[in-house]
């Protein structure tokens, strides 16, 4: 099977759109399919920033275009704080993003929420730039 894809970026939201297929027996919906996004947080916070809200608006639009998509929200924290505290903080961050989606019309049934705390850093380092990249929710 040969599928041509176009990757489209809207803010920090990545969508993939199937454009054509060499296999005539398979039909592809031309609607954009949500792929991923990352929402960043301030130190020890689980509130959304204005930049995060813009990213989430784009994600809501992509999810509304294809109502069959299920998403996973994975909450993360930097390494400061105890393991237990960071797991709880990652959970609060993921729940905040979930609440935003639900308030904007995305069914809770389409959303899975989990936390990894500090266990899966995006960046290794002990400086503010590294910490900032690790304070996040990944939407997949």
Walk through the language-model features, giving the residues of each.
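Periplasmic OmpA-like peptidoglycan-binding domain that tethers envelope proteins to the cell wall
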Residues: 74-140
């Amino acid at each position: 099977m040969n599928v041509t894809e176009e990757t489209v970026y809207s803010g920090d939201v990545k969508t993939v759109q199937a454009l054509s297929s060499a296999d005539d027996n398979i039909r592809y919906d031309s609607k954009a399919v949500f792929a991923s996004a990352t929402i960043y947080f301030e130190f020890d916070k689980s509130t959304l920033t204005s930049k995060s809200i813009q990213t989430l608006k784009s994600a809501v639009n992509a999810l509304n275009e294809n109502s069959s998509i299920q998403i996973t929200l994975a909450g993360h924290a930097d390494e400061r704080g105890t393991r237990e505290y960071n797991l709880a903080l990652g959970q609060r961050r993921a729940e905040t993003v979930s609440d935003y989606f639900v308030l904007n019309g995305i069914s809770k049934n389409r959303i899975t929420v989990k936390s990894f705390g500090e266990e899966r850093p995006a960046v290794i380092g002990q400086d503010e730039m590294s910490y900032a990249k690790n304070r996040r929710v990944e939407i997949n």
